[in-house]
Amino acid sequence: MVVVIRKGTAWKYSSLTDLVRVEPRFHLSLAPERLGLYPKVTMDLAAEKHDLIDPYGRVVRDLRISVTDRCNFRCQYCMPAEGMTWLPRNELLTFEEIERYARVCVEHFGIDGIRLTGGEPLVRAHLPKLVERLALLGVNVALTTNGATLRLHAQSLADAGLSRINISLDSLQRDRFLELTRRDELDRVLDGIDAAIEAGLAPVKINAVMMRGVNDDEILDFARFGRERNVFVRFIEFMPLEAGDVWNDKVVVPADEIIETLRAEFDLEPIVRGSEPA
């Protein structure tokens, strides 16, 4: 994999390290229309095919679907330790509804890849059944998970047709992992990574959010971890989720700084990368 920093340019020290700067993407909101076959937004377009174009002029080919807002972690940069109000379960889209919306996007908007996210998608019961339904649309189906219950699901996900998997992991140190996620689950996540490899969900990708003064001293540890486990590591710049938060170097470890840290230890090779999601 590659280390991506900005438009068209990337660096790598091996085939297993990836650095991502998150850019705004085009979002298509499809409100539930439980009485109709398709979302209202597509009713007048069902007979035609339309490309989705983002603000940078790129054709969007990937659809992200959040299957739940619930999570079994309480990561500090994501949600409070307690007091969360979840969507009522009867307000979540059913698997049938998700499949219908996905079919519209595939058949009429040129989508060829679907990523399932959350919350934590694996807390949604019977998720492999949804993966199977989406895979039958002829698209690549990917999953982003915290990995805590992946040992239980990896093989069934692979059998259902899952193409790719990303596992969020922000520290390789047990005490720090506990502090960041408020859950003592590092061993289960590492075991989940092994389970994904054993199930053939290759290449397995690790998403590591770098935060100054929190885990930026683990950059090289993650790079070595990727090489030793034969998994891709994607270093991701921290982006606050709250609209009022300010992007600043007191929290953020800029991509250039991560690259220099890697460069001090490894030889980096410039390569060119397209605009597709990592």
Pin down the residues of each PLM region.
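Short hydrophobic targeting helices and cationic amphipathic motifs
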Residues: 14, 19, 27-28
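A C-terminal junction/extension of Radical SAM enzymes
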Residues: 219, 225-228, 232-278
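Radical SAM/AdoMet-radical enzyme domain recognition
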Residues: 92-115, 123-232
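Conserved alpha-helical substructure of the radical SAM core
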Residues: 44-117, 121-140
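Short, positively charged and aromatic/hydrophobic N-terminal segments
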Residues: 29, 34-39
